[in-house]
Amino acid sequence: ERHITVIPEIEFPAHSDAVFIGYPELCCTGKPYTTGEFCVGNEQVYTFMEDVLTEVMELFPSKYIHIGGDEARKVAWATCPKCQALIERERLDGIQGLQPYMIARIQDFLASKGRVMVGWDEILHNELHSETLVMSYRGQKGAIEAANRGNYAVMTPGEVLYFDWYQADPSTQPRAMYGYSPIKKMYAFEPVPADPESAARNESIIRAEFVDPAAVEPIRADRADRIVGVQGCTWAEYIEDEEQQEYMIFPRLLAVAELAWTPQEKREWCDFKVRMNSHIPLLQQRGLN
């Protein structure tokens, strides 16, 4: 009816602190509040995740299931007997090989159920199925690498497309995560950098410094269709209520929408700004802050 697909995300193997309050045996220490990562060497973890994902798939018809895969600190794995035993048994590349092992198992499980795995760009350490979708939040490189490898990718670089970053002088704004992403910066980003100049401009926006086109690898022209979209993210650590959330998202969402739908050669900032200003009263009429 609304042409929206809700994609659930179940974070794995990190950002899982809440799980260990009820299931402390699933982390390496056996105690809550001590680590945010599942124990890779504990077979119960995979039973738990398969049970959770099975229920999620019953609730959500989405073809895509997001498993996270980001920001695993790996500290507890280094001293965990079960993790070390798994490294030896499977001849993994130390603790760095543990996350790819976990992700591969979950990827295969989802595929066996006819679903497609989505993950943040750390999953590029894996051999990925051809349909697996990579969300590139640490700059644009993850999406470029994924596309050039033949995988699908979504551009969502935190330095540009995070709505929880400041959109103006921080001294004039409600408290935000950090950074600086005004609407003009968002609008200047090119989601499909299929030539050195576009890739270098993006990198200059991300780094806030000049970048030589010769120093940046673009997406191969025959892989440009592997970038399937852009995503603006709103993390809520510093967002206190719905009004503040709307303030952080709008009108920047208008710029992100145009990035998603309009080719680079048809985008022009001054023209967009005129059209954006005409939309602001419409947003206000709908009660948006």
Please provide the spans of the model-predicted regions:
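Substrate-binding cleft of carbohydrate-active enzyme catalytic domains
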Residues: 1-117
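Flexible, acidic glycine-rich loops studded with aromatic residues
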Residues: 117-122, 127-132, 136-289
